[in-house]
Amino acid sequence: LQLKVPMVLFVTEDLVDFVRKRRGDDIIVNMDGGIGGSWTADDQTEIIIQDIDEIPYYHLKDNIQEILDSEEYKKNMADPERIECKQAMYSVIQYSKFRWLIQSLAYNGKECDYFFWLDAGASRFFEGYDLSKEYPSEEAKKSLKDMGDSFLVQMNTEYYKDLVNAETLSLDYLYDNRSYVLGSMFGGHKESIVKVHDIVDNLLKNDMIANRNVNNEQIALGYLIKKYPDVFSLYERTNGKHMDLFQELG
């Protein structure tokens, strides 16, 4: 929360004071969770209050849980003991990241051209980053501009060489447990946010749930970066650091 960058934060009402104390800047609080607001270039924080049942994909929770509990799913899925294979809310939150990015566009899409998702717990991977610096750096902003309207993700190249080097991945990969794309941080130009939301939403509903399958958003992105290479820009991690992309943009 102390990172010097404009933020849109989606929280339950009990966390508003916690955020206020740690952001310490101009804050807009949207009490009804609706889309709209009055973001200006001078504002640094917008807090969107949402109850649990207002999480974008909450309406899929019972359907997902029914799939996860089925014997067919446990038989077909690699490593079905993973938390995302047992608790529906995990996938509800993971896939809601993309809808939250869309909602962020509605608040300040006229003021900002680039949007990134950052997990609430991602600060444990900042590795001593100097929080007094503006984020991202001017050099990083130039790199983002040079990227055009693509969506930036970190691809971890060190471990699953067959996945990294594959030209395409079959739908069988949606049952895999080998994630090679970072899910803690991703984003890009506002035009790409809409494109990626739509293809992720389609994958979740029509390639996963319709076939009685649910897997995490890293698996989804790993499949999609191969299927739609023109939509994505890839930062190839080679040093084993979990969130090296964060440092690269700093």
Whereabouts are the PLM-identified features?
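Short coil/turn segments at secondary-structure boundaries
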Residues: K21-R23, D62, Y129-L131, D198-V200
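Active-site-proximal specificity loops/subdomain of glycosyltransferases
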Residues: D25-G109
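GT-A fold catalytic core of metal-dependent nucleotide-sugar glycosyltransferases
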Residues: M89, I93-L152
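Short beta-strand/turn micro-motifs composed of small residues
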Residues: L9-V11
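Short, acidic, metal-binding catalytic loop of nucleotide-sugar glycosyltransferases
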Residues: L1-P6, R22-I27
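Short, charged/polar "capping" segments at the starts of alpha-helices
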Residues: E13-R20, K161-L163
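Catalytic core and acceptor-binding pocket of nucleotide-sugar-dependent glycosyltransferases
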Residues: A122-G128, D149-F151, E158, E167-G250
